[in-house]
Regions:
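C-terminal cap of thioredoxin/glutaredoxin-like
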Residues: 1-30, 64-66, 80, 151-222
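Short N-terminal signal/transit or membrane-insertion segments
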Residues: 20-26, 36-44, 121-133
Length: 222
C-alpha cells in the first residue's frame, strides 16, 4: 500500500512538472509569435528603391505598400499629400516606396510594372504610382492586368505599353521585386502599409499627427 502511495506521489510530481513545462513553452511561443507580428526597428535600406525628395534630406520616410491594398490607397490619398506638403517639398524628408505582395498575382504584376517604370522612366514613376492607386476599385476584384498596367503606363510615362506587357510576361524585373521581398522579410513586414520614419515604426499609418511628431522629433535630433 505504501509503495502504491509513493508511486502515485511520484507520478503526481512528474505530471505537475510536465504541465508546468508545457505551460511555459506555450507562453514562450505566444510571446515569440506576438513579437514576430511586429515590424522590427532599424532603418530600412532604400538602395535601388524609388525616392521622392532631395537626396540630402535629413529624414527618410519609407512605405512598405501593396498596390492592391485598400489601406495603402487611403494612406496615399489622405496621408501622403500632407507629408509631401509639410516636409518633402521643403527638403526635410525624402520618401521611398517598397513593394509588398500580399494580394496574389495582381500585386506581383503591379510591382513588376512599377519596377520597370522606375528603371526606364524614373521621372514619371510617382505619377504612375499615384494613378495605380487611384485605379484601385472600392470592391475586391481582380483588376490589375497587363492591359490596365499598359494603359496607365501610356498615359503617365514614356514606357511603351507593348514593351511593358512583354516584360511582364517575361518577368524581366523579377530580381528587383525579389529584393523587395527580401527587405520585407528582413524588416518583418506583415501588414500594409507599414511606415518607417528613419528607424521608427509608425503604430497607426492613418494618424498623421503621430507621423508628423515623429518626423519633427527626428529633425530636431539631426
Amino acid at each position: 500500500m505504501k509503495k502504491k502511495q509513493q508511486s502515485s506521489a511520484k507520478f503526481a510530481v512528474i505530471l505537475t512538472i510536465v504541465v508546468v513545462v508545457l505551460l511555459a513553452a506555450i507562453v514562450i511561443i505566444n510571446n515569440k509569435t506576438e513579437q514576430g507580428n511586429e515590424a522590427v526597428s532599424g532603418q530600412p535600406s532604400i538602395k535601388g528603391q524609388p525616392v521622392l525628395g532631395k537626396d540630402d534630406a535629413p529624414v527618410t520616410v519609407v512605405e512598405f505598400g501593396d498596390y492592391k491594398c485598400p489601406s495603402c490607397k487611403v494612406f496615399n490619398s489622405d496621408i501622403f499629400p500632407k507629408i509631401q506638403k509639410d516636409f518633402i517639398d521643403k527638403g526635410d524628408v525624402k520618401f521611398s516606396f517598397v513593394n509588398v505582395m500580399f494580394h496574389g498575382t495582381g500585386s506581383r504584376l503591379a510591382a513588376l510594372a512599377s519596377e520597370e517604370v522606375w528603371k526606364e522612366d524614373p521621372d514619371s514613376f510617382w505619377a504612375f504610382h499615384e494613378k495605380l492607386f487611384e485605379k484601385q476599385p472600392d470592391t475586391e476584384q481582380e483588376w490589375v492586368t497587363p492591359a490596365v498596367l499598359g494603359d496607365l503606363a501610356k498615359s503617365t510615362t514614356k514606357v511603351k505599353p507593348e514593351t511593358l506587357k512583354d516584360n511582364l510576361d517575361k518577368e524581366t524585373f523579377a530580381s528587383q521585386v525579389e529584393k523587395d521581398s527580401d527587405l520585407n522579410q528582413k524588416m518583418n513586414v506583415n501588414a500594409t502599409p507599414t511606415i518607417y520614419v528613419n528607424d521608427k515604426v509608425i503604430k497607426n499609418f492613418a494618424d498623421y499627427n503621430e507621423i508628423k511628431k515623429t518626423i519633427e522629433k527626428e529633425l530636431k535630433g539631426k
